[in-house]
C-alpha cells in the first residue's frame, strides 16, 4: 500500500487555488492507484505548523512529538503533496515551521560537519509534488520564487523526484475567470504529474 501525505499549508480553509489543484490531482492519482493510504497534515491546526524555533524553546523544539514522529512518517511514505500558496513572497510561515521541525541533521540529512564529506539527504524514498499559487506572474519577483526554494530544500534532503504546478498571476491574469475555470486550464499539467506520482 502506498502511503501519501498531504501537507496543507494554505491559509484558506477550502476553495483556494491549491485546494482545487489538490482535488484534481487526487482524482487522477486515485483513479489509477486504488491501494493508497492518504494522511492530511493541516499545518494550520497542528503544533508542528504553529511553533516557531526561538530562544525560549531551543532546548525542546526538536521533540519526539513534533519532529521524530513526522520524520519517521516521511521516511515511510511513498510521496508528499504540499499545498503552498505564496505568502509575502515566500511559502507560508506554517510550512517554514514544519520544515524547521523535520530538517534535522542526521535524521533527514547527514550533516557535513558531523560526518566526513559533503551533506547528503536521507529522504530519497520520497516523491514530492508542490501545488502552488501566487498573485504575481512568475519572474516578477525572482527573489520570491517559493516553489524553487522548496525544490532546493527537498533536494538537499535527498528527494530526486520533485514536481510542481503553480498557478501564477492570480491577481492579474484571471480576473474574469472563476478559480475552477483557472484550475481547468492547468488540468493537463496536473494529470501528467499525478500519473507519474
UniProtKB/Swiss-Prot annotation:
In its keyword annotation, does this UniProt entry include Flavoprotein? Answer: yes
Binding residue positions for FMN: 10
Reading the lineage from the top rank, the first entry is Bacteria
Which stretch is the leader sequence? none
Chain coiled-coil ranges: none
The reply to whether Transferase figures as a keyword in the UniProt entry is: no
- Cofactor(s) demanded: FMN
| Catalytic reaction annotation | 2 a quinone + NADH + H(+) = 2 a 1,4-benzosemiquinone + NAD(+); N,N-dimethyl-1,4-phenylenediamine + anthranilate + 2 NAD(+) = 2-(4-dimethylaminophenyl)diazenylbenzoate + 2 NADH + 2 H(+)
Q: What is its EC number?
A: 1.6.5.-, 1.7.1.17
Record note on cofactor = Binds 1 FMN per subunit.
UniProt xrefs under Pfam families: Flavodoxin_2
If you read the UniProt record, what top EC class would you report for this enzyme, in one word? oxidoreductase
The alphabetized UniProt keywords are: Flavoprotein, FMN, NAD, Oxidoreductase
Q: Name one GO molecular function term.
A: electron transfer activity
What is the annotated quaternary arrangement, including any partners?
Answer: Homodimer.
What the entry lists under NCBIfam families is as follows: PRK01355.1
Family under the similarity heading: Belongs to the azoreductase type 1 family.
Q: Which HAMAP family does this one have?
A: Azoreductase_type1
Q: What exactly does this protein do?
A: Quinone reductase that provides resistance to thiol-specific stress caused by electrophilic quinones.
Write down what this protein is called. FMN-dependent NADH:quinone oxidoreductase
The record lists the organism as Mycoplasma pneumoniae (strain ATCC 29342 / M129 / Subtype 1)
The gene coding this protein: azoR
Amino acid at each position: 500500500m502506498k502511503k501519501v501525505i498531504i501537507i496543507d499549508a494554505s491559509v484558506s480553509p477550502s476553495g483556494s487555488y491549491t485546494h482545487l489543484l489538490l482535488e484534481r490531482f487526487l482524482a487522477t492519482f486515485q483513479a489509477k492507484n486504488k491501494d493508497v493510504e492518504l494522511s492530511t497534515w493541516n499545518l494550520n491546526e497542528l503544533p508542528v505548523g504553529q511553533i516557531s524555533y526561538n530562544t525560549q524553546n531551543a532546548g525542546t523544539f526538536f521533540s519526539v512529538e513534533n519532529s521524530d514522529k513526522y520524520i519517521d512518517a516521511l521516511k515511510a511514505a511513498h510521496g508528499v503533496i504540499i499545498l503552498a500558496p505564496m505568502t509575502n513572497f515566500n511559502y507560508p510561515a506554517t510550512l517554514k515551521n514544519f520544515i524547521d521541525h523535520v530538517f534535522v541533521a542526521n535524521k533527514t540529512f547527514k550533516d557535513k560537519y558531523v560526518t566526513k564529506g559533503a551533506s547528503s539527504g536521507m529522504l530519497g524514498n520520497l516523491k514530492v509534488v508542490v501545488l502552488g499559487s501566487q498573485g504575481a506572474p512568475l519572474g516578477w519577483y525572482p527573489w520570491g520564487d517559493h516553489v524553487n526554494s522548496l525544490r532546493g530544500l527537498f533536494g538537499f534532503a535527498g528527494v530526486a523526484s520533485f514536481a510542481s504546478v503553480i498557478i501564477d498571476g492570480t491577481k492579474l491574469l484571471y480576473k474574469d475567470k472563476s478559480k475552477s475555470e483557472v484550475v481547468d486550464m492547468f488540468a493537463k499539467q496536473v494529470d501528467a504529474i499525478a500519473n507519474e506520482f
